[in-house]
Amino acid sequence: MLIDISIKNYLSFKNETIFSLRAVSNKKDTKVNILSLKNDIDVLKTSVIYWYNASWKTNLLRSIQTIKVLITDSWRLGPSDPLFALWWLSLQPFRLNESTRKEPVEFKITFEINWIIYRYELSLDWMKICSENLYSKKTQKEKTLFKRILQNITIYDFDDNNSIKRVNENNLALSIFAKEGSEEAKMIHRFFQEIYVFFWDWSPSDSELMMINEYETFKPFLKSLLNKADLWIEDIDFSLKEIPFNQLPKSETLKAQLQSQWIPIPENVKSHIWNMYHPVYDDNGNIVWQHAFSVNDESKWTNKILNLAWSIYNVIRQWKILFIDEIDASLHSSLLLSLIRSFNKTNTNSHCQIIFTTQNTHIMDIKKTLRRDQIRFVEKDKFWSSKLSRLSDDSIRKEYITEKNYYKWIFWWLKNNEERDDLLND
């Protein structure tokens, strides 16, 4: 499970910013939203992030995606490849300060695998790894597994499978160790592979969509989700069809992207085809047959739910971690509430975690849905640096955290307005 992420000098985050999923001890808050790990660590299963306009909240999710790709894929880089060659990664430092724009990006992440707490630290620029450290804790005492400064790597208590010499200045040692067969590194590698970051310009790959046909339980899940959204689709099917590359939507844009990565342009590609079956009625209101509609005939909202459904299903089924940017762009409030409550349940979807950004005010009722430590805010300071806070950091009275009072306290929080005295305890 994910515990903490620290970001420093990355995109809009100038100073060290910690996104923590550690639960704050409060007897008044419900316990169903947390899981207890070793060493007396209670971890939240869900977290909601609100933002003020132009606060760059998406950069928080980009940092997660960057850490994931670096760990899972940096072994692919040749000795002279820049780090941003990995999936168009952005490794820009904070550029609105003369000092930070010349300094490396820094990440720290704490997570749990099989009751072991790991802490991983990373510092890098666009061409090289500056430092890299890995620690673990099974009991109360933390031990160092390996440390790295530039190309000097010291192994303390870690099986690198004799692959230390294969680490170039632009490869993460952890990524190389996993590729070369280190069992502990492979376990950590799998953990990061199972973190999903969902942006709305993303859609499932053909391989993921092919998996849908292999899982009989996904189809009822998807139908249930669509029908809860009042779409009343009777049936769904999916197939792959080979079509000429130039017939793809936005083929010229795709072509330019492939050419920028020195990837050959294929003559034909496999495109996924969804059919949605809606009932056809006779004059007496009886269903007489079903008509198949292409997914292109469905609404934009239906297509968004379709894209998101696979990620939600996969995370629930395999106990993974899901970050979603602007979840309210797809899900109706009732669906969103149902999803949050499902993830919050301790005995259901046991080790799943979901973190999302939203401006949906219908989930603000803490007594029924959220703890105060599950609600976060991203704002920007006068120097245009993003800051992250959570509601439990201040003494706002619990009864004020409702949709009715949203516009009072959200603007107090972000703009420090005159409502402050009304919302704070005496």
Report residues per predicted region.
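Extended helical coiled-coil dimerization/tether regions that scaffold
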Residues: K8, S205-D297, K415, E419-D426
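Conserved P-loop NTP-binding catalytic core
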Residues: L35-V48, Y52, R62-R119, D125-W126
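Short acidic, glycine-rich loop/turn motifs
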Residues: I7, I109-W115, S136, H278-N284
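Coil-to-beta-strand transition motifs
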Residues: K14, K102-P104, W115-I117, W126-C130, ...
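Switch/communication elements of ASCE P-loop NTPase nucleotide-binding domains
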Residues: M1-T72, D282-N416
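Electropositive, glycine-dotted interaction segments
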Residues: I117-E252
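Beta-strand secondary-structure signal
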Residues: D4, I18, E106-T110, R119-E121, ...
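Low-complexity basic/metal-binding stretches
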Residues: W51, W56, W87-W88, W115, ...
